[in-house]
Amino acid sequence: MLHKHASGTTRACACSAAMINPGINRFCDVAVVGGGPAGLAAAVYLSRFLRSVLLFDAGDGRAELIPKTHNCPGFPDGVSGKDLLARLRAQAMAYGTEIVAAGVKSLTARPGAFVLATTTGHVHASRVVLATGVVDRAPAMHGLRKAIAAGIVRLCPVCDAYEVQGQRIAVVGPERSALKEALYLRHYSRDICIICNYPEDVSGSTRAKAGAAGIAVRDFVDDLVPRNSGLDLVMADGSTERIDVLYAAMGCDVRSELAMEVGAHCDEDGYILIGPHAQTSIEGVYAVGDVAKALNQIAVGFGQAALASTHIHNAMLAERAGSRCEKEPEAHHQSPNPRPGG
């Protein structure tokens, strides 16, 4: 079964008129790359620390696709991804963050600063926060984005399995990840199946484990057709089976290219490895949100943003204090009025 990126083609950022282009050779304290929840949260913190912040938003983040999330703290009635992002943008800009509707093409470490080559110019930053996220893989099907918006196709059972309790659920993906996700969803519904194109796509071992958990395996699924309510599995013989929800357990592509450019350590899947303050293996470069090796959740991204921003601010305070201390002995040594008898 072919797949494509859930985000579709890259879109221009639907940004406020308050957003500006950075111009050529701008300097800022911190450059944040990525305008999703984690990047925007970092910008809020850093701006409130009185740091100059440029945030680059290419406008193709996965949060835009969220129809409504009910597990984001503080929103008892749920919140759509677009609404959450709009609130975060307004909050960041209210404290002075400059949001740039542009992507970052490259990141280079230079003495005393990092240089970001953007689609509108070059920016020099003392610190960099990477919040570049991931791109979900999803099944190739007509009307995918509408199906995601309608909640018929879902990408995150941790986020929204609560909302599909007792429904007819199908899972598509490589057999190991599909089985893992199906077993997770089995806690919420008894009607779970794994779908595939051909019988050889799912091994006997996986079938046995699925069967033991009461999970069916549907072979010869040729097409997926969204309906007003649910989705039809179209079999090779032309027959159909209606389900309520399809979960795509197809993995994602991690946007860690900028981190790799400066030599930051990543795992085998491309996720950026971070320390307790969201710092990467490169001093001055931090990673927050889904691009970092952790649970891909908005709340986790918020926490990482707070940790990274506070660490950046404290490190810059220490640098400033250190430079003052280094200058003081030199000034004393050059004093034109030495003490008598000295």
Which ranges hold each PLM region?
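FAD-binding core/adjacent interface of flavoenzyme oxidoreductases
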Residues: 2-5, 9-31, 99-167, 245, ...
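A Rossmann-like FAD-binding core segment of flavoenzymes
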Residues: 11-14, 92-111, 116-118, 123-125, ...
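Beta1-alpha1 glycine-rich phosphate/pyrophosphate-binding loop at the start
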Residues: 20-21, 28-83, 173-200
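Short, well-ordered coil/turn residues at beta-beta hairpins
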Residues: 34, 131-133, 138, 172, ...
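A conserved FAD-binding loop/helix module that cradles the flavin
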Residues: 43, 179-181, 288-333
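Glycine/Thr-rich phosphate-binding loops of Rossmann-like dinucleotide-binding domains
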Residues: 138-139, 179-180, 256-257, 295
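FAD-site-proximal beta/loop scaffold in flavoenzymes
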Residues: 146-163, 250-300, 307, 314
